[in-house]
């Protein structure tokens, strides 16, 4: 038979073990990362998300003493990078991926045969920055306002075209054309640099880009409208879509995400490290130069925003009869 003394000793031992396990959780999290971390970027070198990510990697290296290695995996509208992180790496926090929030939210709506759920399988750790979409035309065209362009397109159905280099811009553009009742020909581009050049050279007559991207095309392009609640400091003459009565045009944000199933201590540690890095003067300066606002929303807020984007774009896709391709 077990004596009361033995029972008490067993209870004490169990309590001590429980406390040691509880203490080990935070300690393990603080020791993470213990080796190099990869940040996968589904954009080419030199593009705004790549530049931002490289600056972020430097700050994370300073904070942890561990290398944060940026790896560009470009292709298939981000699917190459997203599928790699969602399915091919361990859920251990040692691989992250940068994503446009709108890109993840629309991917399942536009792409057939995905082997992962973009919203479920790649939870955001932090929303890094927000930016504007700019609706631009070639500077060689005579239109000075968005409404002047719309009037011209209405008077010439099927004779003008617009472009895009990703599914988000395509979906947003189709929604805009449907709302305004415009008959415009769609021209797809595989690479964003080719698309930007097409706007600058009048190969296409209009299209959405990020604000930072179109800055590189000045003065060969003209911005007629921007997303956001206030006018852009970069293009103050351009009206906001809200001013034009078009309130459903979405803005741009970039998040940093991990594979679903990443242990909570590692997830929380990454969240804290990235939030700390985004608050530094260095990251704020880089963001500003790229025309981006370093909002640094935590994981809970970021997940809610992603779900809202997916819902809103789902409504748009249904309205325009979009089918995955």
Regions found by a protein language model. Give the residues of each.
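An extracytoplasmic/periplasmic, membrane-proximal ligand-sensing/linker region
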Residues: 34-36, 178-184, 264-325
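Structural signal for conserved beta-strand scaffold positions within catalytic alpha/beta enzyme cores
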Residues: 72, 98, 124-127, 164, ...
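C-terminal lobe and pocket-closing loops
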Residues: 212-279, 308-311
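N-terminal signal peptide c-region/cleavage motif recognized by signal peptidases
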Residues: 20-26
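Hinge/capping helix and adjacent helix->loop/strand transition within the periplasmic-binding protein
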Residues: 87-94, 109-194, 241, 251-286
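Bacterial N-terminal signal peptides that target proteins for export
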Residues: 2-17
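N-terminal (or domain-start) structured segment
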Residues: 29-120, 157-159, 168-169, 178-208, ...
């Amino acid at each position: 038979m077990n004596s009361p003394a033995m029972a008490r000793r067993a209870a004490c031992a169990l309590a001590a073990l429980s406390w040691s396990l509880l203490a080990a959780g935070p300690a393990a999290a603080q020791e993470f990362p213990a080796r190099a971390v990869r940040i996968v970027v589904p954009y080419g070198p030199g593009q705004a998300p790549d530049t931002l990510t490289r600056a972020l990697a430097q700050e994370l290296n300073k904070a942890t003493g561990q290398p944060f290695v940026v790896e560009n995996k470009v292709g298939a509208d981000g699917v190459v990078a997203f599928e790699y992180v969602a399915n091919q790496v361990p859920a251990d926090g040692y691989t992250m991926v940068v994503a446009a929030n709108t890109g993840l939210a629309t991917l399942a709506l536009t792409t057939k045969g995905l082997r992962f759920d973009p919203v479920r399988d790649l939870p955001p750790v932090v929303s890094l920055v927000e930016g504007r979409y700019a609706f631009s035309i070639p500077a060689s065209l005579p239109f000075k306002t968005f409404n002047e362009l719309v009037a011209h397109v209405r008077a010439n159905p099927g004779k003008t075209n617009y472009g895009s280099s990703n599914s988000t811009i395509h979906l947003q553009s189709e929604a805009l054309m449907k709302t305004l009742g415009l008959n415009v020909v769609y021209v797809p581009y595989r690479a964003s640099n080719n698309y930007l050049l097409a706007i600058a050279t009048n190969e296409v007559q209009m299209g959405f880009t990020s604000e930072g991207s179109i800055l590189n095309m000045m003065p060969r392009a003209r911005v007629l409208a921007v997303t956001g609640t206030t006018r852009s400091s970069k293009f103050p003459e351009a009206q906001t879509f809200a001013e034009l009565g078009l309130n459903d045009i979405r803005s741009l944000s970039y998040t940093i995400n991990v594979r679903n199933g990443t242990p909570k201590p590692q997830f929380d540690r990454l969240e804290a490290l990235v939030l700390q890095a985004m608050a530094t003067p260095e990251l704020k300066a880089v963001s500003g130069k790229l025309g981006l606002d370093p909002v640094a929303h935590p994981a809970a807020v970021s997940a809610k925003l992603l779900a809202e984007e997916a819902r809103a774009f789902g409504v748009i896709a249904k309205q325009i009869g979009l089918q995955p391709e």
